[in-house]
Regions:
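Mg2+-dependent phosphoryl-transfer active-site scaffold
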Residues: 1-10, 52-56, 63-66, 70-367
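A charged N-terminal "starter" segment
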Residues: 10-18
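A generic structural signal for ordered alpha-helices
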Residues: 15, 27-34, 213, 251, ...
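Helix-rich "cap/lid" substructures immediately adjacent to catalytic or cofactor-binding pockets
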Residues: 20-65
């Protein structure tokens, strides 16, 4: 399949989900990705990955998940390479294709899963608000000037797979098995279930990865989240390196900032800076993406921060604690991975809450993290 055919395939999927005349912001998002990413050949990777994911389900009944950076792309989602819709939170109607944006929440897990549409049908909530621009540095590094020699094809494929981090998550497979055992599909579950939310925000991490559960127990002693949006922040900090210990933890303990002020992932950092560039400078020159990419790989920790960046951050009304936070950060994870992880923990906790017998029979202690 040619590059053009793959993008046409993604466009067709867009129309199937959002109708023949999608909301203009959805169209702009898709066209922006197509304009900037098409030349790097990422659509071919997305399509290949989607095929592997489908094959894993068809042949082995196992869910294969592409995590991290690939999940920031709307095209990847439309092609089936990612299950994370990166658009801002919104309700959409499968019947009339109406879209209603959620303006008052940063995390759709904090909103009820359904709403009644004007046409009388039930609207579903979707969208995790992840920018595609954070994928651009990866796309640029992927593009090769010369064809890959035949004798290096296997190595190239191995590196490609590593780059996209194709992984079978134990939690995803566990949710799939629980859906079969209970007859309740994960797609039918309200992700804002009151009892489940009470358990997770209250510190009940029995269905979580042991290492993450241990981190959250310690983090809850410093700051107790009141919403899934705040819990998502903590999960993002947990997957970073140098983002929590002797950094965000100390900032919160010393009252330098609130949890909501801290960019836990590279995507949040980019979006915050991009918005402030537009507000205070009336333009976005690439500064936000440059800072986010350097913070992502610990550039500022290793090399320090140049005067231009420091002066620009001050101009954008950022305080010293924010600059110190970036200087101490060694690696920033992706929002998509945190979103996916929290989603599966919510689903597992739901099954454990309402179907404890089936949960014990199917899962027990056999989740392979």
């Amino acid at each position: 399949m040619t590059r053009t055919e793959i993008w046409n395939k993604a466009e067709k999927a867009l129309f199937e989900k959002y109708g023949e005349s999608p909301d203009i912001s959805i169209v702009n998002r898709f066209l922006s990705e197509k304009r900037f990413l098409a030349d790097y050949g990422v659509a071919e990777y997305f399509d290949e990955l989607a095929g592997i994911c489908r094959e894993s389900i068809d042949k082995y009944n196992e869910k294969l998940i592409a995590k991290n950076t690939v999940s920031c792309s709307l095209a990847a989602y439309l092609l089936g390479a990612s299950e994370i819709n990166p658009l801002p939170p919104h309700y959409y109607c499968k019947t009339c294709k109406r879209v209603e944006w959620v303006e008052d929440e940063k995390c759709l897990f904090d909103k009820r899963s359904t709403r009644r549409c004007e046409c009388g049908a039930e609207m579903q909530i979707d969208g995790y608000d992840i920018p595609w621009e954070t994928y651009l540095p990866y796309a640029q590094r992927l593009k090769a000037k010369d064809p890959v020699p035949e004798n290096y094809k296997d190595l190239f494929e191995a590196l490609t797979k590593k780059h996209f981090q194709w992984s079978l998550l134990g939690a995803a497979q566990a949710v799939n098995l629980l859906g079969q055992a209970t007859g309740i599909s994960p797609d039918e579950i309200d992700l804002n279930d009151r009892e489940v939310k009470y358990r997770l925000l209250g510190g009940d991490f029995i269905c979580m990865h042991p290492k993450l559960a241990e981190f959250l127990k310690q983090a809850y002693a410093v700051v107790h989240p009141c919403s899934y949006a705040e819990l998502l922040k903590l999960i993002g900090l947990a997957h970073g390196t140098g983002t929590w210990k002797h950094n965000a933890e100390d900032l919160l303990k010393n009252g330098k900032c609130r949890l909501a002020d801290i960019p836990a992932t590279r995507d949040e950092l980019y979006m915050d800076l991009q918005l402030d560039m537009i507000i205070y400078r009336q333009n976005e020159t690439g500064f936000a993406l440059d800072v986010a990419d350097k913070a992502r790989n610990g550039y500022y920790l290793k090399h320090g921060m140049d005067n231009y960046t420091v002066e620009m951050l001050y101009e954008l009304r950022y305080d010293d604690w924010f600059i110190d936070y970036l200087l101490r950060t060694n690696y920033m994870s992706t929002k998509a991975f945190s979103v996916m992880e929290l989603k599966y923990f919510i689903l597992l906790t739901w099954y454990q809450t309402y179907y404890p017998k089936q949960y014990a029979e199917v899962i027990g202690n056999d989740i392979i993290w």
